[in-house]
Structures are given as structure tokens and as C-alpha cells.
Amino acid sequence: MNSKNHHQKKRFGQHWLVNKKILEKIKEIAVLNQNDFILEIGPGKGALTSKLLDSEIKKLHAIELDKDLINLLNDKFNNNDKFSLQQGDILTVNLDSINKKITKVIANIPYNITGPILDIFIGRLGITRNYNYEKIIFLMQKDVVDRILSKEGSPNAGALSVRMQLLSKIKKICDVPPSSFSPPPKVFSSLVVFEPIKNHLRLDISIEKNIDKLLRISFNSRRKMLRNTLNSILSNEEINELSESSKVCFNLRPQDISIEQWIKLAENCIKIKK
């Protein structure tokens, strides 16, 4: 199939990156080397794939959902020994055979699957990862990136920001306008780099699980004070004890609590419930 004859499919959320400067920027921040095993999610017509394969990498494995693009990609890259292609849905595909080989993940994420993609590749609190990615480079919706990077006191602060910041080091590289894509989306995107925190450097799994539980309960009613949300799992006596031992005011709303305070709350909650 000629690439010019392929039209994007709305159901796949296809907005292909065509801005050459951003394509080059992704390659630059990936800091590729001869030991890198790259996983590219949704290569589309292969614009970024070409850039990445032009580097001294060990392997690039691409996963593409759109069956109509498979022959196009194979025709384009089948003479490159570093390239392999798999047709499938990244949300359900089994990566067990290559997961421990992958060093870097690169993707222009369809907006409609951002949440599940973050769960799979950045991870979830209380669950040990079975991979060791050095770097994850995502081009994703700007307002989601802004929420992820939010600090306490910001109206954008939420469970997502606490979870992502506990699981990885995050750096926003730049914002990307709709005109950088074909067809242009309705919103701005951001280029962001995640460096997952190694399992042995993460918090104790029991603490992570407690943080996740506290976040879920608190942010389900984000306009309420902590005192009025956590009373579903704690008595008034326990709330007062937890507030005092953690040095956290329970008259605050969840978006005003810092990550360090969430950690203290989880640690002391475990002690109180023993």
C-alpha cells in the first residue's frame, strides 16, 4: 500500500507526527546507543521509526494496531535487520518475551488510551514491575501532562500526579502545537520523558498500597476536607491520632497535601491499624 493512499482512522485516534523538528527532538532526548532495545508503540507510516533506525541501536520492535499499515511498514523496513514488527493492540498484547530486553519505550499516544498506557508502562502503586525500562518518551495530551506534573496547592493536583511522581522522575521537554500532526488534533500535546524509579528504590509495597487507597478515597470527593472523606475508613479518634502523628491538618482538601505528607499518612495509618 502506498502511504499516500492510507487515511487515518478516527477509531484508532491516529494523528501522525509530521513536524521534523519534533521528530529530531525525540531522537535527541532518547540518547540512543548500541545496546538499546527500543519499543515503539504505534509507528504509523514510520516517520519516527526511520529516525530511530538511523541510530546505532541494537533493536527496534514496533507494535501497530492498524492492519492496513503492516504491509506498508514491512515494505519500508524489511531490509533492516534491527527492525521487527508486530500487529496488535498495545493494551492487550503480551510483551513477556521481550519485556526484560526493552531499554526505552517511545510513543505518540492516542489520547483515548492515555490512562491505560500509563498504567502499563509507568506502573501502579503497590505493584512491582517486571521490567527495567531506562526511559519512556511519550508525546501526549498537554493537559494530562500538566496534571501529572502538578504540585500540591494547584487546582490540577490529583491522584494521578501523586502516583506518577512516586513511580518515576518526570521532565516535560516542550509543548507541541496541533499543526505538528496530520490531521491536527483539537488540543496541544507535550513531549515528556519518564524515568521509572527502580523497584529497589521505591517505597515499601505496603506503604504504596496504603497511599493508593488514601488517594482513591480522598480524591473521589476532592472538594471535601480529609476529615470528611477518611471517616469512611477511620474513627474520629484514629483521625485525630493520624493527624497528630503525621503533622497533617485534616481540614485541608486532598489537592493541598504534598507527596511527603501522603507518605507520612500512609506510614502512620499502617501503625494505627496494627
Swiss-Prot record:
Transmembrane segments: none annotated. Its EC number is 2.1.1.182. GO terms for molecular function: 16S rRNA (adenine(1518)-N(6)/adenine(1519)-N(6))-dimethyltransferase activity; RNA binding. It is found in: Cytoplasm. GO terms for cellular component: cytosol. It catalyses: adenosine(1518)/adenosine(1519) in 16S rRNA + 4 S-adenosyl-L-methionine = N(6)-dimethyladenosine(1518)/N(6)-dimethyladenosine(1519) in 16S rRNA + 4 S-adenosyl-L-homocysteine + 4 H(+). Its main location: cytoplasm. Pfam families: RrnaAD. InterPro entries: KsgA/Erm (IPR001737), rRNA_Ade_diMease-like_C (IPR023165), rRNA_Ade_Mease_Trfase_CS (IPR020596), rRNA_Ade_methylase_Trfase_N (IPR020598), rRNA_adenine_dimethylase (IPR011530), SAM-dependent_MTases_sf (IPR029063). CDD domains: AdoMet_MTases (cd02440). Keywords: Cytoplasm, Methyltransferase, RNA-binding, rRNA processing, S-adenosyl-L-methionine, Transferase. S-adenosyl-L-methionine binds at residues 15, 17, 42, 64, 89, 108. Belongs to the class I-like SAM-binding methyltransferase superfamily. rRNA adenine N(6)-methyltransferase family. RsmA subfamily. Specifically dimethylates two adjacent adenosines (A1518 and A1519) in the loop of a conserved hairpin near the 3'-end of 16S rRNA in the 30S particle. May play a critical role in biogenesis of 30S subunits. HAMAP family: 16SrRNA_methyltr_A. This is Ribosomal RNA small subunit methyltransferase A. It comes from Prochlorococcus marinus (strain AS9601). The lineage of its organism: Bacteria, Bacillati, Cyanobacteriota, Cyanophyceae, Synechococcales.
